[in-house]
Amino acid sequence: MTEEHRLISAESVTEGHPDKVCDQISDAILDDLLVQDPSSHVAVETSAATGVFLVFGEVTSKGYCDVQSKVRETLRNIGYTSSEVGLDADSCGVVVAITEQSAEINQGVARLTGDQETAASREERYEAQGAGDQGVMFGYATDETPTLMPLPIYLAHRLAFRLTEVRKSGEVPHLRPDGKTQVTIEYDDNDKPVRLDTVLISTQHDPEVTQDWLAVELKKHVIDPVLDEVLGSKVPHDNYRQLVNPTGSFILGGPAADAGLTGRKIIVDTYGGAAHHGGGAFSGKDPSKVDRSAAYATRWVAKNIVAAGLAHKVEIQIAYAIGVADPVSVNVETFGTEQGVTRGQIAAAVRKVFDLRPAAIIDELDLKRPIYLKTAAYGHFGRTDVEFPWEKTDKVEELKAAIAAE
């Protein structure tokens, strides 16, 4: 590797990782409430320890969620079905401490209710719904992969997803739910990926498994298929370092080995460290929370900019004040990669094309639907196994037209 080249890494985790277990429980509860009442206001956190879960937070909804049943259902779907793997969904403890949303917070988010909302025009609704909290959110896109995601996090997610696939299908026997992946990519001085450097997989397994056997099976059934699919002939990967369970055995995993908490994998959820993060987590939050909806919206904006060929990569920063509909700031950063336009022209086009008030985002991306459990593992962005509305590139022509009209 030359002095001008650099190594960039990103990690992912499987759905059986303790923090991801908590994310999925929180989003499963959110989805259940949105099915019954799309206007539910939800902020639900989950924490996990050995054999016990605490579900807590605030909910205002016309719906009802049987939290105990939802926790157990989620755990069973992940694969925690016996004490042998470290957790039995049917016998673990579940403690629930959920209260109503603060009236002071609600008054800035839901100024129109009932008949008022029904009678209001779209513009009145958009102005009436302020942000659910203050905060700064970021969205990012880059043309280094077809999904417009950074290659390290995209590849790490694909490996984690495939690891779970072969576990659940039995293609690789003796695997257990907990697992992590990490990828290191070499970039040249033009910020182009030029070589795969390292693939790391740590996976929980049955006691009878040897590490040598596991390394062979994972290379055959997980690593090689994913590398061929994602990298193909575009990025050399014939001489990389493979690490599988580098500390040795990994029998005890999940919440039995490490405590879990909702919102503790925010870099895994987003861009793997390639972009800034405002700090707000996603899971368990309904779309009135701009931590979630605005992060989705900024990804949507960024992806359309790159898809339109206006820049090779772009980061969007947006900020809100609680109870105020319009963003207090929107910033566009293209890192000097803009193509035939200025950064200022792109920023002006964004302001013209995208309405980034919370209610407008919710309407445009249709966010009051039960789509969130699927986001809670393997990344919220750049997915190929499921379609999310913030991944659509439906504003490409409008952006081009806005710039042409300047």
From Swiss-Prot:
It comes from the Bacteria. Signal peptide: none annotated. Keywords: ATP-binding, Cytoplasm, Magnesium, Metal-binding, Nucleotide-binding, One-carbon metabolism, Potassium, Transferase. ATP binds at residues 17, 178-180, 258, 264-265, 281, 285. SUPFAM superfamilies: S-adenosylmethionine synthetase (SSF55973). Its cofactor is Mg(2+); K(+). InterPro entries: ADOMET_SYNTHASE_CS (IPR022631), S-AdoMet_synt_C (IPR022630), S-AdoMet_synt_central (IPR022629), S-AdoMet_synt_N (IPR022628), S-AdoMet_synthetase (IPR002133), S-AdoMet_synthetase_sfam (IPR022636). It is found in: Cytoplasm. One of its GO terms (molecular function) is magnesium ion binding. Residues 101-111 are annotated as: Flexible loop. K(+) binds at residue 45. Mg(2+) binds at residue 19. It catalyses: L-methionine + ATP + H2O = S-adenosyl-L-methionine + phosphate + diphosphate. One of its GO terms (cellular component) is cytoplasm. Homotetramer; dimer of dimers. Catalyzes the formation of S-adenosylmethionine (AdoMet) from methionine and ATP. The overall synthetic reaction is composed of two sequential steps, AdoMet formation and the subsequent tripolyphosphate hydrolysis which occurs prior to release of AdoMet from the enzyme. Belongs to the AdoMet synthase family. This is S-adenosylmethionine synthase.
